[in-house]
Amino acid sequence: AYELWFKQILTEVESITDIFAKDSVPEQQIAVAVGRLHRINRIFELLIQQFGILETMTSLDFMDFRDFLHPASGFQSAQFRVLETTLGLLDSNRVNPTYVKNLDPADAEKLTNAASKPSLFTLVEQWLEKMPFQETENYSFWKDYKKVIQATFEKDRNDLRHNSYIPEPERNQSIERIDKMEEGFNALFDPNLYSQITDRRMSQRATLATIFISLYREYPLLQLPFQFLNTLVEMDENFTMWRYRHSIMTSRMIGARIGTGGSSGSDYLAKTSIKQRVFVDIKNVSGMLIPRNVIPPLPQEIVGKLSFVFEM
């Protein structure tokens, strides 16, 4: 059942990559992509629920037929690996980058073909990099955004300095944390500093576009892009939840034993749920947003472009 559903998920993901592989992505096609992501997320919810049925078995019940599964394992599922690669999972982010050795030549070739094509992550990143509206000849949103960020951090520091209820050592530690956070924000506006951040995969331009979409999501032309990014993150989270529930079930059934495919069992699965995420940079943009009451107002020129031509 899982293989059939993963085949459907792969079909949906490939159709979304076809949409974003075009030089220009029409708004109605973004709506199509959102609908397909919703379908993927409903499938994941079903897959996660099915673990509850499997867990009605006891460990001894599972042991009665476990040996008949050997050496078959989800660890060896070529389709699952193709799905991960199509989404954009890098070999460097895999818990076991030698997984190809467990595949037969025909399946290894399928994986090679998938890896030779632009992943969904790459295509979404390129789409975000083309996002307009952030700057015009007379206006730069990022200058206003940077001023708000700097003022926010300075206010936080001043509040701490004047808070006599917090012991001085703790105040100093909190101020140091704010300083480090500010350094991270400053890297958003400096390509050289941004390139030195090793835990971010998404490009600077794509990250800035994601922030802009998230802050001004209520404007008509940004509503669908925001929904798309939101459902993309939801899919990544569902994938992570599926891995986690898989690891919990495996731990319950076999404890610390080796998995049927030769992996380290529940320990391996638990590690994949933490490390093997694809769209975590989009999710982390939430930590770069600012309160609505301090979001810089956009000039009328940009507001007009982001709004419908005719509004009731």
Predicted regions and their residues:
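Surface-exposed peri-terminal alpha-helical interaction modules
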Residues: 2-312
